[in-house]
């Protein structure tokens, strides 16, 4: 007789008084808002480090006792109220007055395409300077309220961890990202169905899932080729940041 194994994950119920933590975890504004990140750190600094400073991952693992006790901690709740007030005020801001002289928020839209975006280590789809620059552009654009969307690729494996073996050689260690722990969600069409798009790839069609994330005021879209109807080769297009060979890189550029 073969035993069946089930994997269960017990998650805490975030108290209504702290429901704003869920909002914070789903907006990459936390990547440049130190006060927002500090709330998670203050709840459980050890877990915060273990989760690689990932708010969504943190909220899935924090103990029920800790979040329940926090609602009775007057000092924490005062800081929580200040952070949420600042967060809501930021999102309510309109376009910076100087931007209005050059762009019409109702009719103009800037589209920014990049192979990587480095906003925060909890969203590992970047490797270096290009990604950090693109991420900083998104943050600055959000602060200014410019009508703007960012478009990139959603990699299952982003930057690698560098380790040194016993012989002094650098060893690259890749970690697969669990999308459920990223501040993203599927894009829906007018019927409320999950949106896929199709791209011609030299004689055949590649299907791509469309995901979206919010970084302050900046809306970001990401494409993901990990769909069963695609060939294994095409599913590799968004498997790893700068992975594969020249052909893979060209396919990534075509998708963008």
Task: Specify the residue positions occupied by each region the protein language model found.
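Catalytic cores of carbohydrate-active enzymes across secretory and cytosolic contexts
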Residues: 1-256
């Amino acid at each position: 007789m073969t035993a069946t194994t089930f994997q269960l994950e017990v998650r805490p119920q975030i108290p209504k008084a702290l429901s704003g933590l869920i909002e914070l975890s789903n907006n990459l504004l936390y990547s440049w808002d130190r006060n927002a990140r500090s709330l998670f750190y203050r709840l459980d600094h050890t877990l915060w480090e273990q989760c690689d400073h990932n708010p969504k991952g943190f909220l899935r693992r924090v103990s029920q006792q800790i979040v329940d006790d926090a609602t009775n901690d007057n000092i924490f709740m005062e800081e929580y109220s200040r952070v949420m007030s600042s967060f809501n005020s930021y999102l309510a801001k309109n376009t910076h007055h100087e931007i209005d002289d050059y762009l019409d928020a109702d009719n103009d839209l800037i589209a920014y395409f990049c192979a990587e975006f480095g906003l925060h280590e909890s969203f590992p789809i970047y490797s270096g300077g290009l990604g950090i620059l693109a991420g900083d552009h998104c943050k600055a654009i959000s602060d200014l309220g410019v009508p703007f969307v960012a478009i990139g690729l959603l990699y299952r494996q982003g930057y690698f961890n560098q380790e040194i073996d016993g012989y002094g050689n650098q060893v690259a260690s890749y970690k697969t990202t669990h999308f459920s722990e990223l501040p993203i969600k599927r894009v829906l069409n007018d019927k409320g169905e999950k949106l896929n798009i199709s791209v011609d790839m030299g004689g055949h069609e590649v299907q791509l899932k469309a995901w979206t994330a919010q970084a302050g005021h900046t809306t970001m879209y990401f494409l993901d080729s990990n769909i069963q109807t695609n060939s294994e080769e095409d599913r590799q297009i968004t498997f790893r940041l700068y992975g594969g060979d020249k052909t893979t890189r060209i396919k990534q550029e075509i998708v963008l």
